[in-house]
Every structure is written in structure tokens, then in C-alpha cells.
Amino acid sequence: MACNAPNQRQRTLSTSGESLYEILGLHKGASCEEIKKTYRKLALRHHPDKNPDDPSAAEKFKEINNAHTILTDTSKRNIYDKYGSLGLYVAEQFGDENVNTYFMLSSWWAKTLFIIIGLLTGCYFCCCLCCCCNCCCGHCRPKSSTPEEEFYVSPEDLEEQIRTDMEKDMDFPVVLQPTNTNEKTQLIREGSRSYCTDS
């Protein structure tokens, strides 16, 4: 398609945000009512059904309709007023809510900041080692300020602890047998719970 029209210029994205207003013949701060009135007037004048002999009328009508669609949508209009047609393109690609973030990250100071941090950290290699890998999988991590005590339990001490726990459990025998249950038995009874056997 580009080979057929070598003299046709590729349309560039503007950042001024004025060309849609110029299509409708309005100034940049026009109200919604002015936009609607002008759109109706121009749409009737350039409608393809009213101008069947003029092939450019259909193209002009599409431009007018596109300008009206964008300028009557408040979020698209705010993006267009602030960033121009480039902002609308970014909104299509990344969403309306991410337009400000895109332009902030593509500003000169953000790019400069990324380059400086990248150079200072050795292409972010230091950040990766310190934050992600904790310097060689934890071998070089900084020592904690509180010393960790060595905790060792001998098998004899462990056996003695188990024996004393079992003896304590033998002091309180089970006096109630479990009740029969079926599918309709509730797992948790209504009312107060009692874990005491003295009742």
C-alpha cells in the first residue's frame, strides 16, 4: 500500500492537541455544547448521502465523527488536551489510567535517573545480588546484630521430655465416650462449650 503512494506523507502523532478542534472549527477550550452544535452542523453538511458526487465528503465525515467521539468523551478529551494524539495512541496501547505513567517514565529526567543508577550499580548487577540473591545465595549476607545461640538437644534429653509429657497425659483419664454420629450431626454444638469433666 505504501508502494502505491510514494508521495503520500505518513501522518505523525502530535503532542499539541489542537488538530481535532481545528477539524470542527473550534478553539481548544470549547464547551461540550459548542462541540455538539458544530458536529451536527458539519455532519449534515459533509454526510456522504447528501454528497454522493464528492468522494472526499465521506473522508471528511469520518474525520468529523472521530473528532466528535474523542472530544465528547471526558477522559479521552483530557488526555488529548494534555498530550495530543500521541496520548490517545498510548491510551489505546496501555490503557487510559497508564498514560501519565508512560509520559513520566519517558521524560528526560527519568531516563537520566535510570542510566545513572544503572552505571552506579554495575548495570543493576549489585542490586540483583544484594536484593534478590542476598550476595551469593546468602553466603555473603550481613551478620545479624543479635547473636544466634547454638541450640542442640541430645537424644537422651528428647526421650526424657517425651516420657514426662506422656506421664502428664496419664494423670487425666478420658471419662466420656464419643457419641454416635451420622451425616446430620453438627460438628460444633450450639450453645456453650465445656471442656471440663467436672460437670
Curated annotation (Swiss-Prot):
Note the subunit structure.
Interacts with the chaperone complex consisting of HSC70 and SGTA.
> What keywords are annotated for this sequence in UniProt?
Chaperone, Lipoprotein, Membrane, Palmitate, Phosphoprotein
What kind of membrane protein is this, topologically? Lipid-anchor
Which Gene3D superfamilies does its entry note? DnaJ domain
What domain of life? Eukaryota
Q: Which residues does this entry mark as bearing Phosphoserine? A: S14, S16
Tell me how the protein is altered or processed after translation: Palmitoylated.
Entry's InterPro entries?
Answer: DnaJ_C_subfamily_member5, DnaJ_domain, J_dom_sf
J domain sequence ranges: 19-84
Pfam families, sorted = DnaJ
Q: Name one GO cellular component term.
A: membrane
Q: What does UniProt list as this organism's lineage?
A: Eukaryota, Metazoa, Chordata, Craniata, Vertebrata
Under PROSITE patterns, the record lists: DNAJ_2 (PS50076)
According to UniProt, the name of this protein is: DnaJ homolog subfamily C member 5B
Matching entries from SMART domains are given as:
DnaJ
User: In which broad location class does this protein mainly occur, judging by the first location in its UniProt entry?
Assistant: membrane
Q: Which residues form the signal peptide?
A: none
Q: Where is this protein found?
A: Membrane
